[in-house]
Amino acid sequence: MTSCKTLLTLGLLLASAAAPAQEYRPGSSLFLTPWPVAQVTVPFSLSATGTQLPVRWGLDVAWLNEQNIRKGINFIGRENLGIARSSFQMNEPLVGDTTLTKAQQTMLRRRTAAINLISHSLDIVLNADQGDGSSQYINSYYSSGNRANPERWARLIDASVAYMQEKYPAHKVVAVSPFNEPDYTPWNEGTLANFKEIAKLLKENYPRFENIAITAGNTLNNDHAANWYNGVKPYATWGNTHQLAGSFNSFANFWKQVVDDGNYPYADELHNVGEAMIAVHYGMKTGIWWGFDSRARGEFCRISNHGTRLAYAENRATWTAASVYRDDATGQAKAFVGGSERQANNSTYLFLSPDRDVYFDGQGPLRAFRMEYPGGTGYQTGQTNAERVYNITSGEDVERKPLTAGEYKIMNKGTQGLVAALGTDDIVQNCYTPTATPRKQDIWAIAPASDRIGGDYSFYTITNPTTGLHLNVLNNSTESGANVIPYNAQNASNEQWYTEYAGDGFYFIRNRESGLYLSLRANRKVSNISIVQSSLLTGANLDRQLWRFLPIDAPTETTAPAAPTGLTGTPQSASVRLNWTASTDADVDSYTVLRADADGNGWNTIARGIAATSYTDNTCRPGTTYIYKVVAVDKSLNASEPSTTIQARPGNDKDMVASWQFEGSINDESANMMDAVSPEAPAYQTDAKVGAQALALNGTGWLQLPYEVGDMDEMTIALWAKWTNNSKSWTRLFDFGNGTTQYMFLTPSNGTNMRFAIKDGGDEQTVDAPTKFPANSWHHVAVTLGGGTVTLWLDGQAVGSSTGVTIKPSDIHPVLNYLGRSQFRTDPLFAGALDDVRIYNHALSQEQLRDLISQPTGIASPEAEESRKAEPLYNLGGSRVPESYKGVAVQKGRKVVRR
């Protein structure tokens, strides 16, 4: 499953996870996704201090391509470009051993003209243009048989710098690279000794190089970088390498060495955002892009210079890396993933936001998001140079629906007109009345680009399903004002688009080739207005660039529905149940639930698309007061004003938090709706300990529990288990955590003993039973944590205890909470059966555990009349019922019999 496929299948995952439910249950488990195991976890917090790692970014004109420069400017922004790489040529002998030839001067002028598109006063590094290494590019005057003439080579470099200083004094030459990829002998430049001698001559015999740096050999294979750096000391002070071959270890270690030496870490030919992330992590200060792809690189350059890195992770075995950055000016956050251009392998990353619900490219609310990076099978085999960026959004105004694959109308904000394909030479905007039926030319199929499309795959294709023609920027233009037409260029880069959420349900739509914005041409007409691409507009003109993706049957209108009313919040043992009165508008499609801290700060969208007038918030933390409000959203994605706000908090009593009885369902039977989700259809067996059925796990399945189910100072986890794969060690009965550095788990066997372990980044703290968990028969097991003591219980008897466990579950704040699965990739899944799994927010006593074990139905004993009225009462569907209700109900988070 690739990240693109993730976009397509998220809804399917959610649907399959919810499939066992017998009714619509509006709680956080609607959004809980049971992601498969990932190789690397990337935890981050949007509120973290983070690390600022600014980089001097640049573009390359050694490969002279004006389109690359224009793309780089549009995506990176001129303000973020501080350097460029140009080239001197060895193709002709110097005139009189001192002066550049006309052809050499012409190429410097052409390259400088391209640099001038960025700025007329940009710093420049001059690099050797070796071409293909033939005599056409390297004249024997300079080198022959891979042996250089250092004196002539030095004179050539000096003459090239002198020409630039004379003709372009505003461009400062700050460094020179005597050879390009010198470790690749077919280039026929010269030896390491030749390189050092050239550098020595420049520094000792040419005064103009007193303040111009010499870069070390920019090796093709980074395994050779240290040799071509150490071998040119002390004359070369800029460490430099490419990453077209070589190990991850030597790449990282090279940058660390340059930094440790007090020299300048410089990469003059970057090919992938993954390579850039890794180099930045280990110290690179200046990076120049060879060629230029588009979005991921541009956004990484922008945010790295204006923001803070919140997380970084790498997979050296697959030559990939990932990171999360926050723009400190706008608050926007982005996740990046990339790898080696020629050596990356398939890899998986799980981005984890333990303390806040977020949205990844509009998917959410989520605390965890898994993506798959598409690598190759060997060096330059199956490689696509893949890279990807995700928008991470949160707050009061997030995407109102995820933009998944499907058919849409695209409505402009300013005119409420629709994008329409007319003929084969123009795309225009037509205006319709709000209820008009769209024509075939008004419908667009949105699909994520293939992750193997080549390079950056952070895009969509936008296609008219009737004609098969795509939104296409005419002639691959990178200029503002270029027409957008219906065409079929086989999903080329000028037919790929990406979205940026702009608020109020509207998006910017930007082109991969140009980075410019889909826009209505300025026109007083209200229909048949041509659509173009444009730079970002301002003021009232901005509406011409704002678009909304509407369902085909939705009206084209922007009138907000009436707000919901009567919002109430009922405290429960580990949740707040919200109820409200529906909006009076008939076309209201769903509701959005927002929550803030008690002081009114930090509003966030904790649920959206709710097709009911109630919601159970079980992502609230114990003992914490919140403010809530609800918004109505209609079919056209217009949002109402919010309801009046209320204040609420979960209850403070010692009570049950969740109960999973597995009677044909993995739903929680408490009022907290801590419903589990499964990556496959759950299986049940009649060999049960409590009730008629138990959850059957065959070593391939597992359950994921809601994010906040284990976030407590004290707790009890109690369950019945029948363990059948007893030949395997390190299976899990439960494992709550955030990866392999934060967890608490119970394993039936570590090889010799049943063990409870808890870890919060430091040393693991454990409690062992004297033996393994008994196999092939039902037994009750519990872990109690509280009062400074952790105890393991088996069939109501304490079998292990410790007062030396100082870590509390709330210290970990676990969100990856599993039954039958480990945080560790290599640990086997549990095989056997589970029944009557319960979690309490306090440590049960031995007497309470024995009472629990003796309840064969999993239902509490009938309560006295006076205790009945103390707390609200709910039926098993979660709806509140009157005190006169008879039968099995839920009160204070547990089942009770009402007589």
Segments from the language model and where they lie:
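Conserved aromatic anchor
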Residues: A574-V588
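Beta-strand-rich modules
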Residues: D617-N638
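Substrate-binding cleft and catalytic face of glycoside hydrolase catalytic domains
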Residues: P43, D60-N222, A226
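Lectin-like carbohydrate-binding module/patch detector with strong preference for beta-trefoil
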Residues: V398-E557, V677, W702
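Extracellular glycan-associated modules
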Residues: P402, G651-E680, Q685-L849, S854-Q855
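Residue-level detector of functionally pivotal "anchor" positions at catalytic/ligand-binding pockets or at interdomain
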Residues: D553-L567, R649-K654, S845-R880
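Extracellular fibronectin type III
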Residues: V633-N652
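Substrate-binding and catalytic surfaces of secreted/luminal carbohydrate-active proteins
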Residues: D158, A162-V174, T185-T415, D426, ...
